[in-house]
């Protein structure tokens, strides 16, 4: 008995320790109650508890293939639902390549992992991507807007990129205008449909039932309510019609005797 009691005590202690252990937000890279952290180069660590990083990559190649390289990080604060971006400057070689791709009407592609706080591989769960004509990005002086669409589980389900003002008009662009991205970012959480007003419906139903219980007369039929008026009228009609029927019968008999 003593050994069994000691075993139960140890089991309870272990359960309490597991329950009290700090949990890690799944896929967010943020511990509950953790202090602020710096963002690593690989995007695994976030700036603070509740903030996760997504590796933002881009690709602009002369061929049909894609060769994604790091463009920066998208920082998603899951506590207040805000999104921000940190991006690196384009090198001279990248600026020249972007011009070459724009000259042949090539594409500029961007992508982020589906699971925030993860790198390439099986943990990332794949990527979501978008693209615009490279010439429109060049003529916008690298001014674009990134919109991140997420689901209720915190996974990325969509990414869109729009450049301003857009279009390819063949305008001349200075090299210094292609050094830094001028990016605005926004987060699109899932839209929840309005649920049924179950509580209001139940409350209204209970009020109707209570009202019916207070006024049982309302449950009676039309005849049950007005029988004292209906019966005299029926009797009057029956009695007033009886002499007419007798008179018509007598007149018919006299005619046949002649």
Curated annotation (Swiss-Prot):
Q: How does it assemble?
A: Component of the ER membrane protein complex (EMC).
Q: What superkingdom does the record give?
A: Eukaryota
- Please list the residue ranges that the record places on the Cytoplasmic side of the membrane: 243-258
- Residues making up the signal peptide according to the UniProt record: 1-25
CDD domains membership: EMC10
GO cellular component terms, A-Z = EMC complex; endoplasmic reticulum membrane; extracellular region; membrane
Record topological domains on the Lumenal side: 26-221
* Similarity field: Belongs to the EMC10 family.
Tell me if Endoplasmic reticulum is a UniProt keyword of this record.
Answer: yes
One biological process term from GO is: protein insertion into ER membrane by stop-transfer membrane-anchor sequence
Does this entry carry the keyword RNA-binding? Answer: no
The identity of this protein, by name, is ER membrane protein complex subunit 10
Query: What Pfam family is a match for this entry?
Result: ECM10
Bilayer-spanning residue ranges: 222-242
Q: What does this protein do?
A: Part of the endoplasmic reticulum membrane protein complex (EMC) that enables the energy-independent insertion into endoplasmic reticulum membranes of newly synthesized membrane proteins. Preferentially accommodates proteins with transmembrane domains that are weakly hydrophobic or contain destabilizing features such as charged and aromatic residues. Involved in the cotranslational insertion of multi-pass membrane proteins in which stop-transfer membrane-anchor sequences become ER membrane spanning helices.
Q: Which UniProt keywords apply?
A: Angiogenesis, Endoplasmic reticulum, Membrane, Secreted, Signal, Transmembrane, Transmembrane helix
The effect of disrupting this gene, in the record's words, is: Knockout mice show no cardiovascular phenotype at baseline. After myocardial infarction however, capillarization of the infarct border zone is impaired and the animals develop larger infarct scars and more pronounced left ventricular remodeling and systolic dysfunction compared with wild-type mice.
* Tissue expression from the record: Up-regulated in the left ventricle 3 days after myocardial infarction (MI). Expressed predominantly by monocytes and macrophages from bone marrow, spleen, and peripheral blood 3 days after MI (protein level).
